[in-house]
A protein has these predicted regions:
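Carboxylate-rich, polar loop motifs that coordinate divalent cations or form catalytic acidic clusters
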Residues: 1-209
């Protein structure tokens, strides 16, 4: 484990312990605690649980112990892929997990994962590489992918799916999406700079050249 990783996790432990019965902070290690030192994202949910997305599994820390989730070939409700890229909790408290080949929601009641079907604009089903997830102020949830541009989450009752949208940008390699205080949507790409969209959906392109 790198010193940077160890330092971050030690700080997280101290932060969590400040609200969990006065526990003392401690250092976490890959050998005993984490599934991997290659961390992609660290997130603390509304219940105080710390989630750590790594290149070898999803780690959950409740203040007392770690639980590691990995893909199980015989279990359709396990992680889609051990390489977890991103995590996002929406306003409803739903925890989304984006991996190398698809999007899932974590079910806290059963400690299992439900895969969200994703469709290209052609109607074909796909399991894309998820790079970023964002809930906008208007309630829209956008999913950026590495290879298939942007998707919009559609929820009807208990049915959830995501469909590709093409109205945004001329790039398939999305790296990050962000909405600022003014409602401007910023989308960073891996091959065509940054795009900004205002509330009227007027765009501006920053190529970096």
């Amino acid at each position: 484990i790198t010193m940077k990783t160890a330092f971050i996790l030690c700080l997280l432990s101290l932060c969590l312990s400040s609200t969990s019965h006065g526990q003392e902070g401690k250092m976490f290690t890959v050998d005993k605690d984490l599934s991997s030192s290659m961390l992609n994202k660290i997130y603390q949910d509304r219940d105080g649980i710390i989630w750590i997305a790594t290149e070898d599994g999803l780690n959950r820390y409740d203040g007392a112990k770690f639980t590691v989730y990995r893909n199980e070939k015989s279990n359709p409700h396990s992680l889609l892929n051990d390489y977890v890229r991103t995590l996002y909790e929406d306003k409803q408290g739903r925890l989304f997990i984006g991996s190398l080949n698809g999007l899932q929601i974590y079910d806290r009641a059963t400690a299992s994962f439900t895969t969200i079907p994703m469709y290209l604009s052609s109607g074909a089903s796909i399991d894309p590489n998820i790079a970023t997830i964002l809930e906008r102020n208007n309630g829209e949830i956008l999913i950026g992918t590495s290879g298939h541009s942007m998707f919009l989450l559609e929820t009807r009752g208990d049915s959830i799916k995501a469909r590709q949208i093409s109205r945004f940008i001329s790039s398939n390699l999305i790296t990050y999406a962000y909405e600022d205080r003014k409602g401007n949507l910023w989308i960073a790409t891996g091959d065509n700079g940054i795009f900004r969209f205002d509330k009227n959906n007027q765009s501006k392109h920053y190529s970096g050249e």
